[in-house]
Amino acid sequence: MSGAMARNKGASFERKVANMLTEATGKVWRRRVRNAVGDSDVVADDPAFARISIECKHANTLCLPAWWRQAQQQAGEQGVPVLIYRQTGARGESVMVDAHDVNPKIFPVRGRHTVTLGWEAAMQWMREMLPVKVTYSPGII
């Protein structure tokens, strides 16, 4: 596949993922149009999801170790790396996350193990476990 076709395929998948995340979480997600090095592919408008760093991949051949390293680098020390991928011809999206972010009591070391979830299970995890409670009172200093 040529470079332009691959970029279009990637951009199309990122838009699809943003729409699916919006539907699944009830929050607006959007594709980041001009990615700089270290930026995630898809971001939420809601600050409660600010730590989530999403990397999207749609490819004929899966390169999970390399993609996971990219997701980890983009997330940095404070972020939560999430790799959403689909192999061409496969049914549905898969979501890879750090096992520590799923259950820190069982997996106390960040970055040592990953867990791959189906879309529905991943969205339940994202809705229930990930949002940071952002509390503020406008007008109060």
PLM segments and residue spans:
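Catalytic phosphate/metal-binding cores of nucleic-acid and nucleotide-processing enzymes, i.e., regions
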Residues: 1-141
